Structure formats: C-alpha cells, structure tokens
Amino acid sequence: ISVCDLPADRGQCTAYIPQWFFNKTTEDCEKFVYGGCQGNANRFETKDDCIANCGCNLPSKVGPCRVSARMWFHNPETEKCEVFIYGGCHGNANRFATETECQEVCDRYQKPGFCYQPSETGPCKGSFPRYYYDYEDGECKEFIYGGCEGNANNFETKESCENAC
C-alpha cells in the first residue's frame, strides 16, 4: 500500500501540530492536526511536500466546471510540466498556476534547480567546449563557455552533466 493511500492519522498524543496529508478520495492535499507521536507516513510538513510525494503523478483533471483556466500539471509519462485547461472546480493536487511552480514542486526530488537554467556563455571571450542540461529536450548538450561567470548548468564533460541532471 502506498503512503498516499493511508488515511490521515493524528496518532495517540495530544500535541497540536498542523500538518498535511494526501486525501485519496479528493486527490488533494489537506491540512490536519497531528498529535506528535505514532500516526502514519501520510504526513507532510508543507503542502508542497505532500504534492511532490503524492500529487505529481496524478493525471491532469479538468473537473466538471466550465471556467476554462489555463493551468499546468506534471505529466508523469514525459516527466515535464505541461499546459491543460482546468474547469475551475473538483480538480486534483497536480495543478499549478505557472510552469515554474509546477517544476519547483514536482521536480524537487528529481533534479537540482541549476538543471533548469539555460546555457550561459558569460561575458569573457574564451572558447571552452562545455555541456549543459537542456530541460526541454531532457539531455545534455554542448555549448561554448567564455571562461567566466555564467551559471551552474556548466559541465566539463557530458558524463558529469548526465550524472548531475
């Protein structure tokens, strides 16, 4: 049984600790009060942690309403954040207002943040072959680095790029 299938469990103690759990019925992350001991693993400190663990692999869900809002969801098949049209009600936890928000939540356990930066030559005039991770294509590609500044998406070998991203 998956952590995400477990019910909210306050535990036996009487502390008042606001936490989040994934509600299998609503397919969303909801607040509950944890007592401080026992309970189960369907308990997260933040809503984003809950979504990252339980929501990002859900299919997009339009819902029955007809607002037609442009939203983003994490597509578990392509492992990318993609646009979908949300009806405005009864969706699920895999729904984000922006692509950046989707990436920050759903990719947090997959790739470091610098893997989403573009290649950056920098202001210097050198000509050093380097590799960067191209998030759109999901692969490491060669680019020319000028020798200074730039960003962290910059690797001397394709292998080191692939290991990092």
Curated annotation (Swiss-Prot):
SUPFAM superfamilies: BPTI-like. The keyword Methyltransferase does not apply. Residues 4-54, 56-106, 115-165 form the BPTI/Kunitz inhibitor domain. PROSITE patterns: BPTI_KUNITZ_1, BPTI_KUNITZ_2. One of its GO terms (cellular component) is extracellular space. A protein binds at residues 1-2, 109-111, 113. Glycans are attached at residue 23. Pfam families: Kunitz_BPTI. Disulfide bonds join 4-54, 13-37, 29-50, 56-106, 65-89, 81-102, 115-165, 124-148, 140-161. InterPro entries: Kunitz_BPTI, Kunitz_BPTI_sf, Prtase_inh_Kunz-CS, TFPI-like, TFPI/VKTCI-like. The keyword Glycoprotein applies. GO terms for molecular function: peptidase inhibitor activity; serine-type endopeptidase inhibitor activity. Gene3D superfamilies: Pancreatic trypsin inhibitor Kunitz domain (4.10.410.10). Residues 1-2 are annotated as: Inserts into the active site groove of a carboxypeptidase and inhibits activity by emulating a C-terminal substrate. Contains 9 disulfide bonds. Expressed in the tentacle crown. Not detected in annelid body. Keywords: Disulfide bond, Glycoprotein, Metalloenzyme inhibitor, Metalloprotease inhibitor, Protease inhibitor, Repeat, Serine protease inhibitor. Potent inhibitor of pancreatic carboxypeptidase A with a Ki of 27 nM, and of the serine proteases trypsin, chymotrypsin and pancreatic elastase, with Ki values of 6.9 nM, 1.83 nM and 4 nM, respectively. Also inhibits carboxypeptidase A4 CPA4 and CPA1. Does not inhibit cysteine and aspartic proteases. This is Carboxypeptidase inhibitor SmCI. It comes from Sabellastarte magnifica (Feather duster).
